[in-house]
C-alpha cells in the first residue's frame, strides 16, 4: 500500500474553511484514503506548524488548539508518528502552560530515552516530569 503525507495547508483548509472548495477536497481526500488503498501520514512538523499557525495567525486559545490537536490525533485516516508524544504534549501545553514545541521536544526526548535536556529555556522544560534540565 503506498504511503503519502499530508501538508499543513491541507489540514488548515479543513479547520479554517477559508476556501470552501479546497476544504471539501481535503475532507474528500481523508474520506477516500482507505478506498484508494492509500495510507496518509501527518508528519510531526506539520502538527507543530498547525499549532503555530492557529496560535499566531488565528489567535486560537490553548483550549481550542487542544481540541484541534486531539481531533487530528483521533482522525483514523491519518497516521502520526509517536502519537503518544503528541497526546502528552497537548495535555501539558494546556495544563502546565508551556509552549507546544517545548512539550513535544521534551516528550519526544523522554520517549526515546533521553532524560537530560540542555537548554536556556528552563522554565518550560522543568514542567515536564522526568526531564532533567541543565544549562550548557
What do these predicted ranges mean?
Residues 6-7, 42-43, 98-99, 121-122, ...:
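Histidine- and aromatic-rich ligand-binding microenvironments
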Residues 1-42, 57-63, 70:
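Short, well-structured N-terminal submotif of metal-dependent ribonuclease cores
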Residues 1-3, 106-136:
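Acidic, PIN/NYN-like endoribonuclease modules and their adjacent C-terminal/linker elements
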Residues 77-120:
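Active-site neighborhoods of divalent-metal-dependent phosphate/nucleic-acid chemistry enzymes
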Amino acid at each position: 500500500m503506498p504511503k503519502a503525507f499530508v501538508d499543513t495547508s491541507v489540514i488548515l483548509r479543513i479547520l479554517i474553511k477559508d476556501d470552501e472548495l479546497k476544504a471539501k477536497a481535503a475532507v474528500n481526500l481523508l474520506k477516500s484514503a482507505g478506498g484508494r488503498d492509500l495510507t496518509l501520514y501527518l508528519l510531526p512538523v506539520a502538527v507543530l506548524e498547525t499549532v503555530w499557525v492557529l496560535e499566531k495567525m488565528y489567535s486560537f486559545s490553548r483550549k481550542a488548539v487542544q481540541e484541534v490537536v486531539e481531533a487530528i490525533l483521533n482522525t483514523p485516516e491519518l497516521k502520526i508518528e509517536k502519537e503518544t508524544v503528541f497526546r502528552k504534549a497537548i495535555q501539558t501545553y494546556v495544563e502546565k502552560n508551556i509552549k507546544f514545541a517545548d512539550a513535544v521536544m521534551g516528550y519526544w526526548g523522554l520517549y526515546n530515552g533521553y532524560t537530560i535536556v540542555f537548554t536556556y529555556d528552563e522554565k518550560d522544560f522543568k514542567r515536564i516530569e522526568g526531564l532533567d534540565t541543565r544549562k550548557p
